[in-house]
Structures are given as structure tokens and as C-alpha cells.
């Protein structure tokens, strides 16, 4: 399971060091794709397969389903870590997530999210949910 929040930097070649705690669970190959909320999602191959199977079952006749599948798959790329535990993030994905130099890498149970430091701060400021509101929403979801 991926948990935690880490501050990292992207170098001039678009490479990001993956937190060492995440590397073993990611495996040799993994998927990097556009995420929601202006971030990137990183999935192990096993988790990607689970998501892929669910997305393949969405009805082709549903416009929203088609749009979501296009969004997710068009941005996806298979990645490997280099010898120093880094991934190269393609330009189109860096643009999608507004990634420049300072980034936040977070573990979100089954995936990793990569955020621009500014976007992560803005997301947290915009949320402005109290712990009570979050607890109420979790209760509505059965958690």
C-alpha cells in the first residue's frame, strides 16, 4: 500500500526520483497517466490491470464513459525506473499537471499521485473541509 507525502524535485531532463518506500511495490514496470485534479497517477501493473478491466466494461454508448476512457488511456505511458530510482515524465504529462521543479509525491493506497507543489497547496486550501465535514462525507460513503 502506498502512503505518505514526499517533497521532491524534477531535474532539467524531466526526471523525478521515486520515494524509496514506493519502489518495491511499484515493481520493474508501471503506468504513469493523467490524473484528476491536475495531478498524475502512477499505478503498479497489477493495479493498472484492475482499473483497465473496469474501464473496458464501461458502455461505449455512454458519452461520459467514452470521454473518461479516452482521458485515462491517451495519457498513459509505461515506465521503468532508471538505476538511480528515477522516472522520466514526458512533456505532455508534465504540462497536464503543471509540473516544473518542486513536486509533491503522495501515496494514496493503490496509487501514487504526483502534484506540482503549487497545485497541491492550492488543492488543500480550496478543499477547506473541516474534519467534521470529511467525517460526515465518509459516513455517507459507508466508511
UniProtKB/Swiss-Prot annotation:
GO terms for molecular function: DNA-binding transcription factor activity; transcription cis-regulatory region binding. SUPFAM superfamilies: AbrB/MazE/MraZ-like (SSF89447). Residues 5-47, 76-119 form the SpoVT-AbrB domain. Its main location: cytoplasm. The keyword RNA-binding does not apply. One of its GO terms (cellular component) is nucleoid. GO terms for biological process: negative regulation of DNA-templated transcription initiation. Coiled coil: none annotated. Belongs to the MraZ family. Forms oligomers. This is Transcriptional regulator MraZ. It comes from Alkaliphilus metalliredigens (strain QYMF).
Amino acid at each position: 500500500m502506498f502512503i505518505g507525502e514526499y517533497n521532491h524535485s524534477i531535474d532539467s531532463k524531466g526526471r523525478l526520483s521515486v520515494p524509496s518506500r514506493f519502489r518495491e511495490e511499484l515493481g520493474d514496470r508501471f503506468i504513469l497517466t493523467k490524473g484528476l485534479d491536475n495531478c498524475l497517477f502512477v499505478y503498479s501493473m497489477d493495479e493498472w490491470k484492475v482499473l483497465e478491466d473496469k474501464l473496458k466494461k464501461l458502455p461505449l454508448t455512454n458519452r461520459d464513459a467514452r470521454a473518461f476512457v479516452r482521458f485515462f488511456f491517451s495519457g498513459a505511458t509505461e515506465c521503468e525506473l532508471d538505476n538511480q530510482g528515477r522516472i522520466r515524465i514526458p512533456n505532455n504529462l508534465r504540462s497536464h499537471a503543471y509540473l516544473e521543479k518542486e513536486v509533491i509525491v503522495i501515496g494514496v493506497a493503490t496509487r501514487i499521485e504526483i502534484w506540482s507543489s503549487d497545485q497541491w497547496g492550492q488543492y488543500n486550501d480550496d478543499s477547506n473541509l473541516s474534519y467534521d465535514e470529511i467525517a460526515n462525507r465518509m459516513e455517507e460513503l459507508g466508511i
